[in-house]
Swiss-Prot record:
InterPro entries: Anth_synth/Amidotransfase, CarbamoylP_synth_ssu, CarbamoylP_synth_ssu_N, CarbP_synth_ssu_N_sf, Class_I_gatase-like, CPSase_GATase1, GATASE. Pfam families: CPSase_sm_chain (PF00988), GATase (PF00117). The gene is carA. HAMAP family: CPSase_S_chain (MF_01209). Gene3D superfamilies: 3.40.50.880, Carbamoyl-phosphate synthase small subunit, N-terminal domain (3.50.30.20). Pathway: Amino-acid biosynthesis; L-arginine biosynthesis; carbamoyl phosphate from bicarbonate: step 1/1; Pyrimidine metabolism; UMP biosynthesis via de novo pathway; (S)-dihydroorotate from bicarbonate: step 1/3. Belongs to the CarA family. It is an enzyme of class 6 (ligase). Small subunit of the glutamine-dependent carbamoyl phosphate synthetase (CPSase). CPSase catalyzes the formation of carbamoyl phosphate from the ammonia moiety of glutamine, carbonate, and phosphate donated by ATP, constituting the first step of 2 biosynthetic pathways, one leading to arginine and/or urea and the other to pyrimidine nucleotides. The small subunit (glutamine amidotransferase) binds and cleaves glutamine to supply the large subunit with the substrate ammonia. It comes from Helicobacter pylori (strain J99 / ATCC 700824) (Campylobacter pylori J99). Composed of two chains; the small (or glutamine) chain promotes the hydrolysis of glutamine to ammonia, which is used by the large (or ammonia) chain to synthesize carbamoyl phosphate. Tetramer of heterodimers (alpha,beta)4. Its EC number is 6.3.5.5. This is Carbamoyl phosphate synthase small chain.
Length: 375
């Protein structure tokens, strides 16, 4: 059994199918119908519980080759967990996978009702425990727990040292991963790692870019010198967890990189940090965008793209003073992409690499290559 307590006073008890223990985090909902493993292993969900709108979970098991990272969300909530998986590539059940990663698995919850609660109240802090079941004690622990905006989440998911990305890329012909080809000429880019998904790095690799992954706290001078020496051709700012406004030191360094006119590309948190660094602070959405079925309009082509999304924060409309808005969300008309006028920078709020989700926005990686070739 697992007991849940939300900051709005809701107390629930359900079945446990994951790890044992107690976790505190922010509760968000995800509307993806598949790809639960990629969601669970996405560093952007660090410090969060994910409730899936898809009522069934576990039917394809789990395969560690498909992980986005070594990091995980705090826990997952589903209407029904299916222990009997069917997938030729799976090597364990989802339950076994969650236990290995220390992730709580919670089933038997009325997820429809819970998601409606989140839509009404917004994202809520929550505590879940397989150990403590007293409502008052859970309430007390949650009351004294730090808010997610005050937690140093990025530092817990960023690389501690500079490394080269050489992860193999999935081959749909063989249904396995093919090795990185060192013989192919690659432009080298620096990746500021705020919690990068593995498939973002794979897609950068697939368009001919070799990624050197730098810690989130890397000084701007180090990257500027590398660019001036032609050791790198540009900089990519990754996705990541938490409130972008909590990263004040990193924002100061990004401001220096912008002033140096280095070609840059940001996704999700990276997109937000580029905005804040130029004086346009983000604001928090009521319940965020989480899922792989969000329509986004490309304002330059008028095409509508179905995208993968995972964020709680958004850049403000005032960004139009220094940037051309290239994409908008068709659910709420929020900004999804910009091209800056004052520097060679593009950024998007959604995830063009998908994983999970459609790849209708994959062309953005090629746009970044074109940006690099222009400098």
């Amino acid at each position: 059994m697992v007991s849940l307590y939300l900051e709005n006073g809701l107390f629930l008890q359900a079945q446990s199918f994951g790890a044992s223990g107690t976790q505190v985090g922010e509760l968000v909902f995800n509307t993806s119908m598949s790809g639960y493993q990629e969601v669970i292993s996405d560093p952007s969900y660090k410090g969060q519980f994910v409730v899936f709108s898809m009522p069934e979970i576990g039917v394809v098991g789990a395969n560690p080759k498909d992980d986005e990272s070594f990091f995980s969300c705090a826990g997952v909530l589903a209407r029904h967990y299916n222990e009997f998986f069917s997938n030729s590539r799976a090597d364990s059940s989802l339950s076994t996978y969650l236990k290995k990663r220390g992730v709580l698995g919670i089933s038997g919850v009325d997820t429809r009702s819970l998601i409606k609660t989140l839509r009404h109240h917004g994202c809520l802090m929550m505590i879940a425990s397989t150990i403590e079941h007293d409502r008052n004690k859970l309430e007390e622990v949650l009351k004294n727990a730090p808010k997610i905006s005050h937690s140093p989440l990025v530092s817990s998911v960023s690389t501690p040292k500079i490394i080269t990305h050489q992860r193999a890329t999935f081959d749909f012909n063989t249904l396995d991963y093919k090795p990185f080809d060192e013989k192919i000429p690659h432009k080298i880019i620096a990746v500021l790692d705020f919690g990068a998904k593995g498939n973002i790095l794979n897609e950068l690799q697939n368009v001919g870019l070799k990624a050197l992954i730098y810690p989130h706290h890397t000084k701007a001078n180090e990257l500027i010198k590398a660019y001036e020496k032609k050791e790198i051709s540009g900089i990519f700012l990754s996705n990541g967890p938490g409130d972008p406004l909590s990263l004040q030191q990193e924002i100061g360094e990004i401001k220096r990189l912008i002033n140096a006119k280095i070609p840059m590309f940001g996704i999700c948190l990276g997109h937000q940090l580029l905005s804040i660094a130029q004086g346009y602070p983000t604001y928090k959405l009521k319940f965020g965008h989480h899922g792989s079925n969000h329509p986004v309009k490309n304002l330059e082509t008028n095409a509508v793209e179905i995208t993968a999304q995972n964020h709680n924060y958004c850049v403000p409309e005032e960004i139009e003073e220094i940037a051309t808005i290239t994409h908008r969300n068709l659910f709420d008309n929020t900004i999804e992409g910009v091209r800056y006028k004052n520097a060679p920078i593009i950024s998007v709020q959604h995830h063009p690499e998908s994983s999970p989700g459609p790849k209708e926005s994959h062309y953005i990686f090629k746009e970044f290559v074109g940006l690099l070739e222009g400098f």
